[in-house]
Amino acid sequence: MLLEQQKQLISLIQAAVAQCLPEAQAQVQLERPKVAAHGDIATNVAMQLAKPARRNPRELAQGIVDALMAQPQARELIQDAEIAGPGFINFRLTPAARQAVVQAVASQADAYGRAPRNGEKVLVEFVSANPTGPLHVGHARQAALGDAICRLYDASGWDVTREFYYNDAGNQIDNLAISVQARGRGIAPDAPDYPTDGYKGDYIVEIARDFAARKSVQASDGQPVTATGDLDSLDDIRAFAVAYLRREQDLDLQAFGLAFDNYFLESSLYASGRVQETVDTLVAKGHTYEEGGALWLRTTELGTGDDKDRVMRKSEGGYTYFVPDVAYHKVKWERGFHHAVNIQGSDHHGTVARVRAGLQGLEAGIPKDFPAYVLHKMVKVMRGGEEVKISKRAGSYVTMRDLIDWVGRDAVRYFLIQRRADTEFVFDIDLALSKSDENPVYYIQYAHARICTMIGNSGASAAEIAQADTALLTAPSEYALLQRLAEFPQVVALAAQELAPHHVAFWLRDCASDFHAWYNAERVLVDEPALKLARLRLAATTRQVLANGLALLGVSAPDRM
């Protein structure tokens, strides 16, 4: 049922309730019955109102139905209504109401499922990998989730900024530099004098080789960095290695079809004095104390749910990692992004309360729930029934590029979105490569391609199909498909509201299933011209909505397979 139809039906039910219970304030909610045979849409409004009104719920439900069906507008939407159980009202839509989705999709096309612009803006930060190695499968899940969430925000009317925060300061960058230095000097990872916390993948050898060759590299948002070849200068090695890996990560993201609007460097927070300014403000506001030679933040007193106070400045003098995060999010707020979402691995769970506490301590009018977080669990990669743990180039993990090379970008995106972010996920390489109904990407894309081929072979023109009489679409499998297509805008709205693109992935699978069921139950290219055109119009409508849904996930909609 289209959203506009739902709004109209709710208004009509409220009018019917007012006739039965003039003093009642009806909060009418509609839901789809779990069993299709029970109807197209249902409400429990009679059960809600019966007790305070001291009425029998089934009798009240019958009164509401009688008053409702006396309204001519209701009869245009509702074919019949049935009282079920303790007082549910189940409705069956008229054929015209069911078929209205076809014209809605035709008039809106690519915009079907999208909302008008709302004048709001949001910053979504995701991937945000350390520039210390290739992007791994966890980053791939973050990239898929983040880009889909951005697309959902855009579909919901928001202006979206995609941001990548580079953790280019701290011990991990020093470890990167000394690792490249060691490999440049011919020290192998298994040698006793190789750095204890050094990186061991083959990419370290590649960086060392290019550094010695005095090559130049450039990240997408940076200046060219030319290697000096001086292995005694850790500063030179560090600058080249970071630029090299940022460029490598850029290439991974390009292969994924993902472009960021902005890159923000952690080092810039130190260089600009924002980290020190943040610390000074928290001290001045009285939210810190000294103990054991360290500076502590009173996070337990700042109302964000942290269970103990946290060290800001360690006894040896360095800041803990959440301090620049607080500074960074203050900068986000000052840039006018009063709605921000961070997509991170579940191992960042402990930082949520700390960062929010730091922001509260700044007393800058920032809400306690800023920023919002989507925390995802990690990914296990399986092939041939065994877990794949190691990439030779990365040294200790499967890379994002490995996945793309093995199964393609579309499969990587869909598979990493199809489950809730807070659940662990097993990426089955064999399944992603299979051409079967069990592979959801193949199943959905095949539905789209099958429709394109069917229309191309039909001999009917686009104009003929667009003018077809949808009143002829009355088969049960056609009603089921029409109902599914009508749900799409509400699924998009729900996915955006919950920051949960898996809702769209589920819907796409269900829609493809409904299409294949209809295709197998009813011949499309029948001899009767009017029915043939009507069914081609339903197929074309399905093709459009499948394409819209796939686009929200960053997955292609092929015309042929």
From Swiss-Prot:
Keyword ATP-binding appears in the UniProt entry: yes
This enzyme catalyses: tRNA(Arg) + L-arginine + ATP = L-arginyl-tRNA(Arg) + AMP + diphosphate
* Gene Ontology MF terms in the entry: arginine-tRNA ligase activity; ATP binding
* Keyword entries, A-Z: Aminoacyl-tRNA synthetase, ATP-binding, Cytoplasm, Ligase, Nucleotide-binding, Protein biosynthesis
- State its location(s): Cytoplasm
CDD domains on file: Anticodon_Ia_Arg (cd07956), ArgRS_core (cd00671)
GO BP terms in the entry: arginyl-tRNA aminoacylation
The organism's superkingdom is given as Bacteria
Which Gene3D superfamilies does UniProt cross-reference here?
A: Arginyl tRNA synthetase N-terminal domain, HUPs, Isoleucyl-tRNA Synthetase, Domain 1
Q: Which InterPro entries match?
A: aa-tRNA-synth_I_CS, Arg-tRNA-ligase, Arg-tRNA-synth_N, Arg-tRNA-synth_N_sf, ArgRS_core, DALR_anticod-bd, Rossmann-like_a/b/a_fold, tRNAsynth_Ia_anticodon-bd
* Main subcellular location: cytoplasm
Q: How does it assemble?
A: Monomer.
Note the HAMAP family from the entry.
Answer: Arg_tRNA_synth (MF_00123)
Query: What protein family is recorded?
Result: Belongs to the class-I aminoacyl-tRNA synthetase family.
Name of the molecule in the record: Arginine--tRNA ligase
